[in-house]
């Protein structure tokens, strides 16, 4: 099919995801109209009208493709011909093992690449409503600062009750870093919920002295100040930061998320805990657990320090630390299909942070997939998602259905997530040392990461070599 006979795909939003999606489409011979509202309408966080402007950090995080999940994502994106990674590499600044960029040079490079592409038209205009029906193939990549008018239009189309709010993020811990000689599995009152066993939570007990010390640590910890535009956004219902609850009274937590009722510590069954911190399974693979009720605005270093004082979490490895900030994202597992299309209106795809991924690289990766899916659809080709064993596939699985929704967490338990090895399907066999013996501790963790990374990159290369993906 000649490219001149193809109708354009419309991409709404010129951030990391939208820019990557537009490039992937154009590189596959599909004309693109990229709609970016800046400078016609600005946001509280952007300072330029450049495409792919980095509004916070200039770091794309670790570039280690052997033992770090985001480094694996970098490597996969490079193999897939990512514009964002190409421009990041070209504008790299020294940052140790991380990939950091000159933010202005990076944005200028992305803008130039798209402006100069013969199949890309950039329109500087705000899209304030669901695109018209004649736009039969659309990618909405409007990010965490989606304009109010478009956000309201999406709400009305999906029937969701909330789209923009203060996003409460609880810390997530790798299961294999929790000390189960101190913690234990049990649901409150041994209650068996849907799909549960009555032992669905991990419980970490605190005696009175430990509880008082924990409250003191929360109150004394250093917090992240809210930016001006965030201060105007109300808290999401039921998502007060844990340190704010502690400020309301020293016993507040013990009668709230840390209540000890209905639980018996099998390691010390004759002593009732003064308080109990619970962790709930966070992914279907059962490799990640989140700290229930622990949304927080403590600085990341403080979170690690304070949370590792909890019995059983002394050596906790965090897949994600907690946070509280203004965000706009969909309840994607319920609303999107496996190729990021809106179930209620399949001509619309979503990409980037609005889908519930977290981070620059993750946003661009979802844009890359959305662009490839939209191109395949426009060209009449099969839509083949990347394998779940790849970083891209693991991220896609989380967004479109990998997150557990629990009854007690309410109707909106899906939360944004950075890519991490806890999202990957686990290995069939445990890693072994050169002597054939099973590895333990940190050696096992490192070997496991290496094997997951090797598998991901191998499977990504195989996927890219398939006719549908390579087209």
Swiss-Prot record:
The keyword Transmembrane helix does not apply. Disulfide bonds: none annotated. One of its GO terms (cellular component) is cytosol. InterPro entries: FAD/NAD-bd_sf, MnmG-rel, MnmG-rel_CS, MnmG_N, TrmFO. It is an enzyme of class 2 (transferase). Pfam families: GIDA (PF01134). It is found in: Cytoplasm. FAD binds at residues 13-18. It catalyses: uridine(54) in tRNA + (6R)-5,10-methylene-5,6,7,8-tetrahydrofolate + NADH + H(+) = 5-methyluridine(54) in tRNA + (6S)-5,6,7,8-tetrahydrofolate + NAD(+); uridine(54) in tRNA + (6R)-5,10-methylene-5,6,7,8-tetrahydrofolate + NADPH + H(+) = 5-methyluridine(54) in tRNA + (6S)-5,6,7,8-tetrahydrofolate + NADP(+). SUPFAM superfamilies: FAD/NAD(P)-binding domain (SSF51905). GO terms for molecular function: flavin adenine dinucleotide binding; tRNA (uracil(54)-C5)-methyltransferase activity, 5,10-methylenetetrahydrofolate-dependent. PANTHER family: GLUCOSE INHIBITED DIVISION PROTEIN A, METHYLENETETRAHYDROFOLATE--TRNA-(URACIL-5-)-METHYLTRANSFERASE TRMFO. NCBIfam families: gid_trmFO, PRK05335.1. Catalyzes the folate-dependent formation of 5-methyl-uridine at position 54 (M-5-U54) in all tRNAs. This is Methylenetetrahydrofolate--tRNA-(uracil-5-)-methyltransferase TrmFO. The lineage of its organism: Bacteria, Pseudomonadati, Pseudomonadota, Alphaproteobacteria, Hyphomicrobiales.
């Amino acid at each position: 099919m000649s490219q001149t006979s193809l109708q354009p795909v419309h991409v709404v939003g010129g951030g990391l995801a939208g820019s990557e999606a537009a490039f992937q489409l154009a590189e596959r011979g599909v004309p693109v109209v990229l709609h970016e509202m800046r400078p016609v309408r600005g946001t509280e966080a952007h300072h330029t009208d450049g495409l792919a402007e980095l509004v916070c950090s200039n770091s794309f995080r670790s570039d280690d493709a052997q033992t770090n999940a985001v480094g694996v994502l970098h490597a996969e994106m490079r193999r897939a011909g990512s514009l964002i990674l190409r421009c990041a590499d070209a504008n790299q600044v020294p940052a140790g093992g991380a990939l950091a960029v000159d933010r202005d040079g990076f944005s200028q490079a992305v803008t130039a690449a798209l402006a100069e592409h013969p199949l890309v038209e950039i329109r500087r205009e705000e899209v304030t409503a669901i695109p018209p029906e004649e736009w039969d193939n659309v990618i909405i990549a409007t990010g965490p600062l989606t304009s109010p008018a478009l956000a309201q239009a999406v709400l009305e189309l999906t029937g969701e009750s909330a789209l923009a709010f203060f996003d409460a993020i609880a810390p997530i811990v790798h299961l294999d870093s929790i000390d189960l000689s101190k913690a234990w599995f049990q649901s409150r009152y041994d209650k068996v919920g849907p799909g549960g066993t009555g032992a669905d939570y991990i419980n970490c007990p605190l005696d009175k002295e430990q509880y008082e010390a924990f409250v003191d640590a929360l109150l004394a910890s250093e917090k992240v100040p809210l930016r001006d535009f965030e201060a105007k956004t109300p808290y999401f219902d039921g998502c007060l930061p844990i340190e704010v609850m502690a400020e309301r009274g020293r016993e507040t937590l013990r009668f709230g998320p840390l209540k000890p009722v209905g639980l018996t510590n099998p390691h010390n069954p004759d002593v009732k805990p003064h308080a109990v911190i619970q962790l709930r399974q966070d992914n279907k693979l059962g490799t990640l657990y989140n700290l229930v009720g622990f949304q927080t605005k403590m600085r990341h270093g403080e979170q690690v320090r304070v949370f590792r004082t909890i019995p059983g979490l002394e050596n906790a490895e965090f897949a994600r630390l907690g946070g509280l900030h203004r965000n706009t994202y969909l309840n994607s597992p319920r609303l999107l299909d496996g190729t990021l299309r809106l179930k209620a209106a399949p001509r619309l795809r979503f990409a980037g942070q609005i889908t519930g991924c977290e981070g620059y690289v993750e946003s661009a990766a979802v844009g890359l997939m959305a662009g490839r899916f939209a191109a395949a659809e426009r060209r009449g080709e099969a839509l083949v998602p990347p394998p779940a064993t790849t970083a891209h596939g693991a991220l896609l699985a989380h967004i479109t259905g990998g997150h557990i929704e629990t009854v007690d967490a309410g109707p909106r338990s899906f939360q944004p997530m950075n890519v991490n090895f806890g999202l990957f399907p686990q290995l069939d066999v445990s890693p072994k040392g050169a002597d054939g013996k099973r590895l333990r501790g940190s050696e096992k963790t490192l070997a496991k990461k290496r094997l997951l990374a090797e598998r991901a990159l191998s499977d990504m290369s195989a996927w890219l070599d398939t006719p549908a993906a390579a087209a």
